[in-house]
């Protein structure tokens, strides 16, 4: 990679760069970086800032849920899946954990600042890289572009919304259908809109048929804004996310969010009981119970919907730029 090193050093010197922000999680310096060590960058001394976009702690914690093989039709295929899940998957998880801890230790050693997307992300980084100085870590969320005006209360309908990629391994849309089978059948006037496309679209439509869900529509890939405006409740059922931009997007539109309490940033995005609801990780029965309560309790839902836009404003581009400016100047 000498060509890459020479090019980057030349560019940094010519541009008189003060700060280099690495959005690749260790792609500039470290074991998998352009530079193996920080000393190789001495010709172009810059402040190095690494940005963590995902929740690696949650990715490791729920590794088995994301990578588990399922759905084989034949007996031999089911046997292969069983052997992989029982024998290979635990080994792969241990290797992934070792690699991630090695990467985080190198980030802590080679970078001046490490930016996570949430306060909880800072804590998780230190769990994987113990001894990381607290002053090296900062939490700056992703920005949420503002909307012109939130919908009026009379625009809201009895609709629950999902927006995202139809990928069960991470997004858990199959969980949502099972949850809806518990909650939605009790209130047939309510409707679930699923906006998005992905590799599991056909399987999800088959699951909806098996569960005999009549008040569900698969909308495909669409502009979600009109759906946010008319929906009253937003459901995210992901195994984990890096941030979860759809949650503050929903709050901007007075659409009350629900999610599993399964990753760090969600606890910054949703204040339980005030701006939305967090269910215990992957407890579908409790999620359905809370969803049913939210659909039935108009005053509770209205109070959360009114609190949402103000909380979502914390993630405005202006606030995020202000935090970045503060970090870069110190």
Describe the role of every protein-language-model region.
Residues 256-260:
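Short hydrophobic beta-strand element within catalytic cores of glycosyltransferases
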Residues 167-182, 199-205, 285:
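A conserved mid-protein helix/loop that constitutes part of the nucleotide-sugar donor-binding site
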Residues 148, 152-171, 177-180:
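Conserved donor-binding/catalytic core segment of Leloir-type glycosyltransferases
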Residues 286, 293, 300-314, 323-326:
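A short, well-ordered alpha-helix in the C-terminal region of glycosyltransferases
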Residues 261, 271-273, 277-284, 293-299, ...:
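Conserved acidic donor-binding segment of nucleotide-sugar-dependent glycosyltransferases
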Residues 239:
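Aromatic "clamp/platform" in nucleotide-sugar-dependent glycosyltransferases that forms part
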Residues 89-136:
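A short, active-site helix/loop in glycosyltransferases that binds the activated sugar's phosphate group
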Residues 202-221:
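Nucleotide-activated donor-binding/catalytic signature segment of Leloir-type glycosyltransferases, i.e.
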